[in-house]
Amino acid sequence: IVFHQVTGLLNSDDECWHQVKEWVEAARVANTLFYNRLGCMGHYYSGMLDIYSDLTQQYAHFGGHIEIIEVDELSVLRKEVTDEAIKQKVAVFKESFAVQNDCAQYELERSARTSVALDALVEKYKLGSMAYYYKGAAGSENEDTISSIILGVSLLTARGIPVAGEYEIKNAQAMKIMDSFGAGGSFTEYYAMDYTEDIVLMGHDGPGHITIAEGKTKVRPLTVYHGKVGSGLSVEMSVKNGPVTLLSVVQKIDGKLFLLVAEGESVAGPILEIGNTNSRYKFPIGARKFMNDWNANGPAHHCAVGIGHIHSKIEKLGSLLNMEVVRVC
């Protein structure tokens, strides 16, 4: 019989009740995952082998429901968006983001149309998270849709419906876990190291979690997208300075999943100002050992980053889900 025990005093025992609180939080997150509806829109990125997921194993470990969605459906919903809805969504953009002066009104309205359509898609399927990617073909209707999606999916992520790019289903699950714990959960990957500062630089194009940003998230125009057709608006942010937790859902050679965790710190410093999410991270074991130990566990190159140190909560969630939890630092 699986059981979990907290030992302490009924009264005047802060540590005891801290543990009880974490178990309750973990149970709530497990329940959220069990009833979550994950939307998967588009297709995988060619040759990105570490990203591919066994959907049956996702069901087996987390429960929930996975809805396979065509980009065409979002394109159809865009046609139904009214001018007034576009106007209202542009106002939301200007309130939620620091829209840079070189962002054309046409691009804001194009992104607003897609954002309103995304809201309708989420409502139709009652989605609690999402993964998407669509390479597209130049000149197609779907190009217009997918090249104007970033602001909309960033707003969804900010309101508790985390969206992962590059059809990263495992990371959509990790982001949902982090967000359900109230830690955020932004889509990221490591891309560079600063050996002098002992820093790992991490970030990604596409959606960012604007509620855990250091300052207001900027909106910038991009003339070229990474791995997809078209051009449009993107978001630029850094994760709040302070303690952070990284989480990856990893698939083992036998097909089963486990949770990979690292705790570190988001630190101030220069980042690439290229319309992406970019942050600088320090780890207690150092940048080199972090990279070696993290990669030794075989994760995909994406992970979810959230604010605060919550390994102990994730450990309890793993116990409730009967999943191994591996801590790197």
Residue ranges and their predicted role:
Residues 66-69, 132-133, 184-192, 327-329:
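Flexible, glycine/charged-enriched surface loops at secondary-structure junctions
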Residues 1-90, 96-97:
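Cap/lid and interdomain-hinge subdomains that line or gate substrate/regulatory clefts
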Residues 52, 57-62, 74, 78-86, ...:
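C-terminal and late-domain segments of enzyme folds
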Residues 13, 45-48, 76, 136-142, ...:
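Flexible loop/turn segments at secondary-structure boundaries
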Residues 157-273:
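C-terminal catalytic subdomain
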Residues 228-329:
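Extended hydrophobic packing segments that form well-structured cores
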Residues 88-181:
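Long, internal scaffold/assembly segments composed of regular secondary structure
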Residues 53-61, 146-151, 320-323:
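Short, solvent-exposed amphipathic alpha-helical segments in soluble enzyme
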